[in-house]
Amino acid sequence: MFGKLLTKVFGSRNDRTLKGLQKVVNKINALEADYEKLTDEQLKAKTAEFRERLAAGASLESIMAEAFATVREASKRVFEMRHFDVQLLGGMVLDSNRIAEMRTGEGKTLTATLPAYLNALTGKGVHVITVNDYLARRDAENNRPLFEFLGLTVGINVAGLGQQAKKDAYNADITYGTNNEFGFDYLRDNMAFSPQERVQRPLHYALIDEVDSILIDEARTPLIISGAAEDSSELYIKINTLIPSLIRQDKEDSEEYVGEGDYSIDEKAKQVHFTERGQEKVENLLIERGMLAEGDSLYSAANISLLHHVNAALRAHTLFERDVDYIVQDGEVIIVDEHTGRTMPGRRWSEGLHQAVEAKEGVRIQNENQTLASITFQNYFRLYEKLAGMTGTADTEAFEFQHIYGLDTVVVPTNRPMVRKDMADLVYLTANEKYQAIIKDIKDCRERGQPVLVGTVSIEQSELLARLMVKEKIPHQVLNAKFHEKEAEIVAQAGRTGAVTIATNMAGRGTDIVLGGNWNMEIEALENPTAEQKAKIKADWQERHDAVVAAGGLHILGTERHESRRIDNQLRGRAGRQGDAGSSRFYLSMEDSLMRIFASDRVSGMMKKLGMEEGEAIEHPWVSRAIENAQRKVEARNFDIRKQLLEFDDVANDQRQVVYAQRNELMDAESIEDTIKNIQDDVISAVIDQYIPPQSVEELWDVPGLEQRLQQEFMLKLPIQEWLDKEDDLHEETLRERIITSWSDAYKAKEEMVGAPVLRQFEKAVMLQTLDGLWKEHLAAMDHLRQGIHLRGYAQKNPKQEYKRESFELFQQLLSTLKHDVISVLSKVQVQAQSDVEEMEARRREEDAKIQRDYQHAAAEALVGGDDGSDEMMAHTPMIRDGDKVGRNDPCPCGSGRKYKQCHGKLS
């Protein structure tokens, strides 16, 4: 009560914000008369003038009033449309990192031209983001004449564009496109092989249309680029035949390797390495089978992929044993957990090892379909320097916008007072009674010539209603968000006299319903219309418009309450645009999912007390309040799910940003010589530490093991034992320095042989290729970790903390493996000339091109592992039953002994 009193005296926060912005609106209005006197050329010259002032140090805020006045005047000349004061307010809200709630029909598309123009003056690019390709193209083409009049360029970013077309779109001052496409371009840029292949500029300003749909409804579904690698099953099978002919090198009790075997096994570290004899033997076998050119080396730059396959096959044969490390069941290789002894169906070893084991066992070799890159919209849009959005319904989600994105919501007043009549909900006992009442209401509206928009929550429900209308011989149109262009036409004409349109909640969003129909579309449908034709179309429309207004305007008929109040408000907002007449009503039944799950007991108890008969409805504010409380519960639960998803994805996001930043630095750097030097010192030191522990006595040193490891992994043949025998003053530190210096000398010799420029380019290629491969494996490991992390809760551990800790360990492991693998490859590979590096790059691109990339806006349940079963209401990916359907009276499969209908069948 005290809060209400304070609001009455001082105004709400929203009122105070608008009051502050009104001062700037007054300034813009004061400039209008002067700007009207400017010639077209003088008005166009304003853009160059503003850019000069910004370059001289002026802020966007200081030129806002003049810039907005310029756009308003240009719009009057180009479109014959003048921005209302409320649209100027909306433009200012959008420029200040906030969300503008503007009702349907208030001209959001025209409002967006103001902040888009202002922020484009910086030259850093503006992204105007819509929910589908049709709206992106429509808004870009509609606003292009205005922006081009003012000297700005406009680009369109939609799926299917070539690389150059994408670059051109992003280099434009203002780029229109869909949220999915901007997100996928970001991921593709971070998978590019060279700076020239990147298309996006640094992310500066994003202006999101239908911001609630993109930042809230789609926040749980990440963008994923996945791909099945090329089918190498033939190669795995061929290489598999080479390994049985290789001989293991014997070991003496002293653990020193003796004899002339082809490979040696370090069982402690679970590693296997070729001996020099083994390398030669494998190369000869590959040449015999035509898999390697005569005189070519397995370790040459162009054969890295072949070497990878050979190593995988060797590991499969020597380190992995059937019925110990894996079992073969129904033609599939299934991993056995080394700690628990349980099988792990669905899990696969990485780096081609699983395929190599499949080849060894003679079962079908499956392609890996791995995640190549992924990001959630929550994390993508937080990368922008400035972010703003507009929608007709944001206030109910204001807390989430502020909490997750740091965006305040400002409700912008309508240009004309809202006169729509929102009637109380009617609640029936059964769905059948509800549908009969809906049909009766539609017939009543048609009798008086009032257009009706029927909103449904699913395509299934819209098809059911359509069948009922066919039965009742009611002419109607059905929309279900499948065909955007057709959709816009139907929605545009949904305001004609007596029109009946059935639409799912999201269908047709972004297109206004004009009372009497859209006369602009009728004119556009004609080829070269004459002035008389235009006048006749407009006169006919005016007659229809007046008739529809007299009949009560557009009637919105909701067939079910959505789980979010915001979606219901969007449906209602279709009527009453720009002060038009209109009405709305929701019809509910106790069989609706929201009522059944959340509001049933209280409301059905109320209905029984009132002694209702069939066909009777209850209409009372208490019922509406109970339903609203049910919706609040669902909204709170969905917010918690999105928040939990973000907390988990933030961990991956921090790692993603580190890897992508490192990758971009690598691509942009002229040389990574210093990086290689630092890595080399770390890697060689780490290997030495394993055999000569720091500050340990000489008796604990494993010198033969170190000699062999250095030779196998770094092609470094050093007589370390000989040095120690001959030089008494050689201690741990000096020995370490000598080994590192020996590697550096060997590497310098390689550099002198091939030339510094060639080696520098090769270093970058190896580093990028290794990083990409390990990052893909890391994403798969993170997926596996996420899927089971919720089970830690049963062990009284915090799943989020456990996930953070273990994912950090995985990331540390990635960095450590990256360093080791890069130095190992650079040590082993023989680069003869520039052509070797080019061939390696060409093969890499070839392999990448063979990957069938799949761009998914995929369901995100896996991102948070177990979801505590709170997804019954979410219409995401349907579950596919695996096995026979359980009958209602059958014993419950859970083993409780009760009938299915009395146990888990209750929940279905």
Curated annotation (Swiss-Prot):
Q: Does the entry feature the keyword Lipid metabolism, yes or no?
A: no
What InterPro entries does the annotation carry?
Helicase_ATP-bd, Helicase_C-like, P-loop_NTPase, SEC_C_motif, SecA, SecA_CS, SecA_DEAD, SecA_motor_DEAD
Q: Where in the cell is it found?
A: Cell inner membrane; Cytoplasm
Which GO molecular function entries does the Swiss-Prot or TrEMBL record give?
ATP binding; metal ion binding; protein-exporting ATPase activity
Record text on cofactor binding: May bind 1 zinc ion per subunit.
Ligand binding (ATP): 87, 105-109, 512
User: Which top class of enzyme applies to this chain?
Assistant: translocase
* BP-aspect Gene Ontology terms: intracellular protein transmembrane transport; protein import; protein targeting; protein transport by the Sec complex
UniProt xrefs under Gene3D superfamilies: Helical scaffold and wing domains of SecA (1.10.3060.10), P-loop containing nucleotide triphosphate hydrolases (3.40.50.300), SecA, preprotein cross-linking domain (3.90.1440.10)
SUPFAM superfamilies tied to this protein: Helical scaffold and wing domains of SecA, P-loop containing nucleoside triphosphate hydrolases, Pre-protein crosslinking domain of SecA
Q: Where, by residue number, does Zn(2+) bind?
A: 892, 894, 903-904
**Which region ranges are annotated with the description Disordered?**
865-908
PROSITE patterns reported in the protein's UniProt record: SECA (PS01312), SECA_MOTOR_DEAD (PS51196)
Q: Where is the composition biased (Basic and acidic residues)?
A: 879-888
Q: GO terms for CC?
A: cell envelope Sec protein transport complex; cytosol; plasma membrane
As recorded in UniProt, its EC number(s) are 7.4.2.8
- Composition bias of kind Basic residues appears in 898-908
Cofactor(s) demanded: Zn(2+)
Please tell me whether the keyword Metal-binding is annotated for this protein: yes
Q: State the annotated membrane topology for this chain.
A: Peripheral membrane protein
This chain's function reads: Part of the Sec protein translocase complex. Interacts with the SecYEG preprotein conducting channel. Has a central role in coupling the hydrolysis of ATP to the transfer of proteins into and across the cell membrane, serving both as a receptor for the preprotein-SecB complex and as an ATP-driven molecular motor driving the stepwise translocation of polypeptide chains across the membrane.
Q: How does it assemble?
A: Monomer and homodimer. Part of the essential Sec protein translocation apparatus which comprises SecA, SecYEG and auxiliary proteins SecDF-YajC and YidC.
This chain's protein is named Protein translocase subunit SecA
Organism annotation: Shewanella sp. (strain ANA-3)
Gene name linked to the record: secA
